[in-house]
């Protein structure tokens, strides 16, 4: 009986054990799926087990069960097969995802991949920009973007939908893409701006006239640019627009944009909470440099930004902002970054205030030691303090973002408090392959070793399960832990794989993981494992299985406060034998309030932290209550400067109350007294005999922080002086060192180089605050070549051209290259001429392109060859075997070489891409049999302005000005008899800031000059308002400065042969920087000259001025004065030229009234009047010598106290109290249309009592585009303008070869029969008159393609033939009747521009000049520079023998605006004389 019961009991026990084994498994359930192509994109739909996976062959797969089963998505029409290139999930709508196709067809799902709808967009998905931009409030609104990029320039085409792509509409074309203003659900939350912001779109668009990144603008539209195609430019800085917008981004409640001006690497970061009020982010004096900032994961109440500090070592500084994103506090120095801008930084998920950061321990030795020593640290108080990670008493260092080997977050997940990482203990972080897996279950306070070796890892079931897979080669097993990583178990896989990805649901609440790898055996088979841990526990956790866990602890181990509360979670205990098993239910934090403390407050608007961080100080004088502060000793109750951080939940009662009002002294609010006159400050130089011509402003660009006005200069004795306050105080940082030359960095306005006569040299990159010496490989050259050449994009790349063997008879020049600002040098070439970097934005792949002249076979008796190389001359290409000179200007490289058919003459060749050169075709009416010199005057983006010397007889030099087409090869005549001097400089100057206005002096008696010599030269000044197409005499004012008549009169506002205004030009200036106009004082010009038949001597000159771009002039002072503009024309200063004085005159109303100011107690001889090159300062500097003591002195004259406020600008097309919209015009056109459009500029009203305070004034808008007229065309090649304004073929010359385009492009289908006209590249006109394309014909052998393209058959053929015939007959009759049958014989009249006169003898179709060639003129002005004679100019080049210190390729409008009129600054290779050198010409050759 007992035996029987024992047997029964045993069987029952076995049965119970069997049931228990079935309920609780020891291993997860693993399901595998194989794929022929590698999965490369995988994502979950939030709160589901639905996964989308994209494979390399373009197929899309979906799984609805966490990856156990997969099916291919074919789409509604089956066209998704092998057509999907990328998957984008909607960040704010968990039901939507988008599959972007390789072509123009794409798909959307709105039900988590169950069904798909196709849509088409007329553009490919963008590759270098975000293809999809999502709306933060309305998930049906999406912007789709496509892009086309060439080098650094991109064209982005944006489209938009408001109904999830049921309909798609074009948005606009831009330079940097478009974004919704509401880029995140939290943006403008609580501001009641729903109606205003609902449809607002912001776009980064090109400058109105300059297609370069430094001119990009940020505009917005509230109706998708329907009512205004251009949009409204945003006032970002102090109520002013900003140019140079690089990027924009939505970061939770912040909208951020970055801007960079030309000439600096410093970025300006602007932040807004509503797109209306913007503030520049203040980094406490720290510079944010180009490509040097990374927006990191941010909170609802602050942004984290890492700023690059050392590009060579890739280290940065971590900053945290206040709640409005305007003031940033430095948290961590020397953060570890990679070259892509990724930063080793991560916030612990869902826990406020805990941050893991890696820093570089040996940051100051990285370059020398060639290896970073990275260490890890953690913060528990939102980055205010950091401490080491510890495993027991050992320091732990973990691999972070820059070396992450998985996807998603690096260390943490929504699993409360669980943190993992791969790393090592010791002094610093070792290689990833040498690391092991470590885990913490208290949010990083303590750590323990988990597994040996590197692993990929993931968290599941809110941390109940941790899974890991080896990341060291191939493996066939996984590891897992169900007790927070204390104990680990392993499970075998079906295949041995190389793991690529381990992931799970984004909220880490699932018990299913997904592992992707490739099989070791084949390498081409790819496996996706679904690993399900549901069976490892048989029960679901109950209340007693959870603990209340404090998320943050202070240094005493107590729960810590952040943002006014403590944070807790109910978390599963590590040893609980259960699973939470609540999929897609995120752990909810528990908040308990704290009393308010110091950490809960931040500085209020218009306050910043003091240096010790303990108080907030005002950034501007405070405004006291009415009736208070009658004297400085009074006090008043005012703001403390603190405010409670928005969103902070601390309890006021019993806590700190830092934001209560405090008693403040009135001395803090009384602003600096304003003055009714300027303030002068003199500095005497007792030991100097003379100022040299070498002085330069290191001007701050618009995106630069700081407000110093730095001037550097040399005395004639080689003493170097620096002033940081515009000459109020001077210092000698290199006292005792004799400096031979100053070479400002042409592309980086904070930098300059100082050269001596030997190998010692110095550089500064911080605006002359510090200098560092370096040793050049050889002394500066003695052949008049540029000593230094600079790279346009890499500020530390240099070419040094120096002298070799000059004491041994074989004196020649060698060129060396440095990529670290002279620390190391490598030989480029021996026996060289000029060498330059030729990298340009319009030349893709030209980053390392260098051009050099070199004597053939390294022998100076041979010809100079022109070579190029893209690998530092490891190999090179010979472009010309006998290149006399070459000049780089904008996008053009222009070469003067000997004519093979006439060795005494030159030919010009031009290249745009730096690879292919084409011979320049000069017009036949410029008959110069022997061409000895060309002066490159101007190249404004789309054309070259060239002076061809006709006569080089000393004292009687002159030539013809010709202009090119857009590729610089085909020229037409613009003006004859333009005067030049013996050095090749031409009396030619473009007006800065205005399109098409230029002034030139011509010789009116060429025949007499040729016979009698220079004594007979009679000069007249002419002006053009349409870029050289039509020239006219300057109209004189009616009265002189004393109100007396000039004795001659003008008719209809035109100058006449006997009565016009004449101005002394460039060739007569003492300082080439003294230009007529200013890039910031739009419309203003000044000059000295006389009224009469011809230009008289300087002794008879008076001072004249125009306010309307040269249309009307007035006499402002009798006698000769020097002038300068300040505050963009708000103040103008003049001082007598070269005669004793102690008084200057200034005007605050654009010259209507002039006030005297005595700047010195003793009379002085003033040599020079200067200010910052952009003419935006309110300080001026007089350079002179005291008459009695003969001492040199500078006098700073400060006008800033004359006005108290800044002018208020409205940037929506409206005028304001302080500004009006001004439109340039042609004096004889009524519609203000120039180059196919009407421009509008903001100009301050002369009566406004305020300052512009604007560093970069620019075109407000293109008011409108105009229809095309005759003025939008010029004569085609081999055609010349007739007296009546029409174009006719030059007798004896053939028409252009129209079929050439077919031969050059074998795929071309058609060509156009040539006409007498070609469209000006600069014009933006549309519709109207078409003169350049009349008859289209098929290319040879392309007749079928041509017919298909044009669809000529049946009825179409009838209309194609009949309509032109009827139209021609109608026009022919109309023209015959109106033109009296006199084709081509039209006189110029006064009724041009009216509709009745459209085809009349006065019609603009025929009266406008023919030779208009484009140039985007906001690129502004061009002054003649001479390659062979710059050493003789007074512009401050190095004179070591006959050398120039450097060459300066022309950049664009910004460089002109920043360095107006300075040949040294503008470019000595942009405006050059391309001629035969003295040493190279035969005895009968003349220069």
From Swiss-Prot:
It is a multi-pass membrane protein. It comes from Aspergillus fumigatus (strain ATCC MYA-4609 / CBS 101355 / FGSC A1100 / Af293) (Neosartorya fumigata). Glycans are attached at residues 300, 324, 967, 1265. Belongs to the VPS10-related sortilin family. This is Vacuolar protein sorting/targeting protein 10. Residues 23-1356, 1431-1487 are lumenal. The chain crosses the membrane at residues 1357-1377, 1410-1430. It holds the Pfam family Sortilin_C. The keyword Zinc does not apply. BNR repeats lie at residues 61-71, 378-387, 438-448, 479-489, 721-731, 816-826, 1104-1114, 1145-1155. One of its GO terms (biological process) is Golgi to vacuole transport.
